[in-house]
Amino acid sequence: FLDECKEINKNENFKEIVIDKSDNPAKIKKEFFKESEIDKIVEEYNDENVIALKIPLNLKKIFDNEEKKEEEIIDIRSYFKVFLKKTEYGMGMDDVIRGPMPVSDLRTLDKSDTLGLVLIEDKPALEFFRKAESANHRLFEKTEELKNSYDKFGHQLLLLKSSIAAIKNIISDKDIEVSDDATKDWFSFGT
């Protein structure tokens, strides 16, 4: 799985999620995809191919403007990457990697049927999440350094923390929808 992720990352072969908002949502939603895109993601996932998504981030960085003697907020666009792959039930696991560092307490797929990786390597995102990282490198939280450096950062933290589970839920919901449609002709009571 990791070798496949490295290859995809090297070739920049990602599906970019388009979020039509100036601020970040707190989680990835089905509405961010066309129905055909969800169908393609589900098909790729069920064929045990790696799903690779680039998730946009809108960061509001605080700068001290020496000339005006005041703080300014500058909008910065960045992103992080999410990889998912179906595996045998019970063999699932995931990790969040910020630069060279794993952030261990954000794991959500242990013992599931999915392998996952969140990769933070774009420079603005690296800086943002480094400032949000706890001293023991185990989670992202509202640190003093983050509060002093960024404005409106809560949704960015939630977006990353929930990204793997949200994408997995979109896939699972579509699988359930397909499964329900497949059996409705056999079990149509009173319709």
Positions of PLM-derived features:
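Bergerat-fold GHKL/Histidine-kinase-like ATPase
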Residues: 1-191
